[in-house]
Amino acid sequence: MSIGPSMPLRLEKPEGIDLAQAARYFGARGGADAATQALLEKCAVPLLAAATPRAVWLEADHDSLTAAGILAGEDVAKHLEGCTAALLLAVTLGPGVDAQIRRAGVGDIAAGVASDALGSALAEQAAEAAEAELRQWAARQGKYLTGRYSPGYGDWPLAVQPLLAAALDTARRAGLCVTENNLMTPRKSITAILGVSDHPVRGHLAGCGHCVLRTRCEYRKRGITCASE
């Protein structure tokens, strides 16, 4: 088995954005108050209208992914323990969402921050929908998948983003590019790997000690972890 070519996943735009998740991204601890809820509801309408979710994926074996430099670090290897292959996934909301976030923030910082939080929540919804499609595919093959594991988790470096994008041909197939600083554009995009196994497998949950966000993580400031929500 080699890498590629990637294949598209059909994603339906959800009827609404998960406002509870958006409130958490917004920094509303313990849930949104009335003013925050109203702001999120107001900003959600144009944000959702601007979204054009797209996703691509492929299946590859460990040797091919290792040769391509994608399986860098120890934690992603632990995540794939017991797996015979892996799926690469990329999901993006499209450039319209980035543009809407910028528009919302002109003269209204709070609306810009709220729109950014809504974009993050919607990107996660799109990734969850894509993962659900892949789980259905795996079930038809009699296979099982781990959870999603993204660059920046544990010691899996953001430096693999260009490699994932190249393997998935995201620029051509989804309009998703990676900058010289390993940042994705459009910004509201997610890449991930999922292990494929012949038996149920959970994958590896990285500890906070290796996470690239450990010094500025809002969850850690509250004495909890992202795995608890």
Predicted features and spans:
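Short terminal or interdomain "cap/linker" segment that borders an active site or interface and mediates
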Residues: 141-219
